[in-house]
Amino acid sequence: MRDEVEHKGESGAVGIGARRCRDAEGVSERVTKVRAAIDAPLLVTKPVNVLWLTGLDSSNAALLVEPDRLRIFTDFRYLEKALAAEAEVVEIPRGLFSKLPELLPKRIAFESESLVHASWAALDAAGIETVPTAQLVEGIRAVKEPGELDAIRHASAITNAMLDRLAEQPFVGRTEAELAWWIESTMHELGAEGAAFPPIVAAGPNGALPHANPGARTIEKGQTVVVDAAAKVDGYHSDCTRTFATGPLPDELARSYAVCLEGQLAGLEATRAGRSGRDVDAVARDVITRAGLGELFAHGLGHGVGMEIHEQPAMRPESEDVLAVDGVVTVEPGIYHPGLGGIRIEDLVIIRENEPEVLTTFTKELVTVGR
């Protein structure tokens, strides 16, 4: 029996998500925003951007956004879905770029981070002037609509419920892979569409690897166990990490947990609209560096989350991305001791003018799990 977590959005409806976000009115507003940001027709080839703008989920489609026209190019497999979109639909063979260049204007903008070289070469050979863009649609997607925020809140509510159950589970004697399977199946039971990404369960020395793959390692007493796992609802992701203890920890790890938590709380306080990702990262990083552990925090403080698990804005030392109201980001410092273990504490938040709306409710105090 599925034990679904009910989440009510600000509108009062249960489980509002991507489908409501992609009604005709919403799509036209999104397209209008893209049109305002370009000075040449934009060829959209990144699948998630095509999906966000039209509602078409396809592995072989392109979208041309023109000032007064919107065209989807796809093959017969996706025609029925494409015809439901608020756009003209043009059927072309599966080899999209064998036919597409002859149907395009002589000058277009394109998504430089998703268009492969062979496809660009086909455009060039057809004499089409190409103008590269970087993260244009992604920058617009970074500010979430109410329905998108509700879907992310729902995914976070399921993640929180899973963590409550996880804290009651035995860890010692189980493998990382067993616990990862339990996490994913529990999120399904709670009503998730699926996991936002393959769950990370990293025990002992594996915890020093930020993106460790759970394997056959058996969890032992006196270790940290880094659990990075979250739910997905209606195409929108959550994200969360908590670090558990399986008994008294070595002093080095116990101190690192306290420092990581202090840095995480400072980063949360700094996560406000109008600040750059670099500046927010620096606030948390300074706390960890002053404690003498800065070299062990080797990744950025956080990233945007939405239809993708990693989106704009980035919060890392070199990032000039500016945080905006209704953006969704992680705040996740980590301290990693090679050969010993790791600590990471991650919350998902909605950016506000002042304090962020924190979606992760599971405690950040160090939880010692049983057996």
Regions found by a protein language model. Give the residues of each.
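Active-site neighborhoods and metal-handling regions in enzymes and metal-associated proteins
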Residues: 2-371
